Amino acid sequence: MGGCSSAFAVSTRMIRFSRGRVPAAILPVTSNDEPCCSCSPENNNKNNDGGGGGCDGGEHQKGKSWRRWQYRRCGGGGGGGGGRKNAILGDAADVKTAAGFAERYRLGAELGRGEFGVTRRCSDAATGEALACKTIRRKRLRRCRGDAEDVRREVEILRRISALGAGADSVVRLRDACEDSDGVHLVMELCEGGELFDRIFARGHYTERAAAKLARTIVGVVQLCHENGVMHRDLKPENFLFANKSEDSPLKAIDFGLSVFFKPGERFTQVVGSTYYMAPEVLNRSYGPEADVWSAGVILYILLCGVPPFWGDNDEKTVTAILQGGINFQREPWPKVSPHAKDLVSKMLDPDPSTRLTAKEVLEHPWLKNADRAPNVSLGEIVRSRLMQFSAMNKFKKKALGVVAKNLPVEEMDKYTQMFHKMDKDNSGNLTLEDLKLGLQINGHPVPETEIEMLLEAGDIDGNGTLDCEEFVTVLLHIKKMSNEEYLPKAFKFFDKDGNGFIEMEELMDALGDELGPTEQVVKDIIRDIDTDKDGRISYQEFESMMISGSDWRNASRRYSKANFSSLSRKLCKGNS
């Protein structure tokens, strides 16, 4: 597989550790950078577009990795010990002691582990029902108020949707939200049926009718959210799992960590999500629930042809493609796709949110309304093979990033927070260009103003010309994680079992086998896309290039030399250690 689909597979961003943010440096400059309130009316949260943290816990399923918590405003709750005054959920917790939790649930085998927590199989002590428990470890929560607010919001959203009963069967159910001295435990419905794309290529015969049925479920989730005042903001195939392995298993949405409450007419400015699925208005920092329909339209496009409608080999090129628009219905298999399907895709990917179909209107479109009568002719092997490689490449990167996450010590995160406060002399909560220059000069490490401006441009998410704690720490963590010689080599060695300095086909098949069961051809395709010198194996340099391409903050340095950017990071760390 080459061309568009190869670039798509290689550059798909793994954002588990930088939760869905596009560097400000690649976004268009707008005048809409003032934060909008996305508060929940119930908790009176004044968090200014507040989603963007939450816990991913590996989406509580095997093979998933925990996403990195985003920094918010610093200097408040969320960390600390187990006393009630340091509570994260507070009165929102169903169980408030370790003894109470142990009495109600029995923890079992680990399903996934990441930078900020662990997901385990668990069971109801009274009934034996199999469940999943996502534990957000207290010691891993940063000392920023937003972390606790994000957890509470995710819990509140899941509770609101779970309370709908049978009407919310397409959303994973939250059973309990518990808190003890160790952290927060979210006990949820266990989904063991696998990812959306895995099910598609496992069946062997994939048709437009099958795509229509899946799309109807996905858009149904969007409609359910919008009816209940919730905007999802991170719709993508990886956030949907099958409940079980049966042929008629329901498909369920499983991740609401970026979701927010909204009111009619409310506009949001925070750029969150996954780049391939972002609507133009999200990139232009003025959006509402219509953006979810766009994301669902991107998923539908991929379901029908195996590649995204707008793509690039890095975030900058992808953003440019999205803003330029234009849908390609010429390449295979589009000539054999029905006119009704193409009509719906076009209307969901309308660049104007005011004329884009609503979720309700999408469900009333003839193609989805009559999904059971959509063409039952195979879309062709090319679609299945594209989806298969996309899924396999994702899992390769997830495994590698999981190793990176495990090797990032808590103390390093704390160090960056303390660094921010030392440099924030006026306690404004923001670092200006002068703050950064002065902070380095005082510590005997003067840095050219152009390099300071580079850091500001790369890290300034909201475009206000300063770095808040979240922005400052996020960019430094990513620079350090991806440039520090300690982390990526450990991830490489995880795959290079024989230690010969190369990842070979057998090693990659063994590493991915438990989760994917990939065919030899799929693994060959992955290696071919990464193997730039065409020797049939992956060197460390090629592995590093794969990990860097298309990834959040690592691409923030694309306009500058990597050496200069890393040098600035080292000076900042050394000057404030």
Curated annotation (Swiss-Prot):
One of its GO terms (cellular component) is cytoplasm. Its EC number is 2.7.11.1. Ca(2+) 2 binds at D460, D462, N464, T466, E471. It catalyses: L-seryl-[protein] + ATP = O-phospho-L-seryl-[protein] + ADP + H(+); L-threonyl-[protein] + ATP = O-phospho-L-threonyl-[protein] + ADP + H(+). This is Calcium-dependent protein kinase 22. The lineage of its organism: Eukaryota, Viridiplantae, Streptophyta, Embryophyta, Tracheophyta. The active site is at D234. Ca(2+) 3 binds at D496, D498, N500, E507.
